[in-house]
Regions:
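N-terminal glycine-rich FAD/FM-binding segment characteristic of electron-transfer flavoproteins
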Residues: 1-211
Length: 211
């Protein structure tokens, strides 16, 4: 069965909209394969309470990785854990977001697995044994159609191109551990400073106006 993996981004213990978009995109792809979506979510203790929310957006299995050191994004721990899970699960595809975090994580995972990667994906289709995606090039002046036959295909969705869609599934919950100790990594987050309140993240804004 060609199951599909989705990486669910969190911030401050909450699931981000781009994370639910990744689950929705994975659900669309899995439906074409007649398979399941397995969603991985990292976070501090208590993040497991979000499993039901993630399941409602199409995840058949929600893999929870709780660790006090994962309150902030840890690139080494996230890369090792996601790559190990994708490899052991033999997924047909792994869906991320082309957010700031996803731009860092998805290429790391692809490099570790020696897998094909496409970022800023606009749409997903299945044709024969290929996953066919649309990807903007030349500052959006050209839209390329790319067919990926290798497994796993690492796909990072452009934010806001697929609206999160609930399908009222009740995903099974699986508890797991980081592939490496977050406290032993070479890069650790010492401090996080939040911007002024009331401002929407650009990656989640429905409309961006630039002059």
């Amino acid at each position: 069965m060609a199951n599909v993996f989705a990486f669910v981004e969190t911030r401050g213990g909450d699931v981000r909209k781009v994370g639910l978009e990744a689950v929705t995109a994975a659900r669309q792809l899995a439906d074409k394969f007649g398979s399941e979506v397995h969603a991985l979510v990292f976070g501090p203790p208590g993040i497991g309470a979000k499993a039901a929310q993630i399941g409602k957006y199409g995840a058949d299995v929600v893999i929870i990785v709780e660790n006090a050191s994962l309150a902030n994004y840890n690139p080494e721990a996230a890369t090792a854990t996601a790559a190990d899970r994708i490899k052991s699960g033999r997924y047909r595809a792994a869906v991320f977001s082309t957010s700031a975090q996803g731009r860092d994580l998805a290429p790391r995972v692809a490099a570790r697995l020696g897998a094909s990667i496409v970022t800023d994906v606009l749409s997903l289709e299945v044709e024969g044994n290929a996953i066919v995606v649309r990807h903007p090039m030349n500052i959006g002046k050209v839209i390329a159609t790319i067919a990926i036959t290798g497994t796993p295909a690492i796909l990072a969705m452009r934010p806001n191109v697929i609206a999160p869609a609930q399908n009222l599934k009740a995903g099974r919950v699986e508890n797991s551990q980081p592939a490496i100790d977050p406290n032993s990594t070479r890069v650790r987050v010492i401090e996080t400073k939040q911007g002024s309140g009331g401002k929407l993240d650009l990656a989640e804004a429905p409309v961006v106006v630039a002059g």
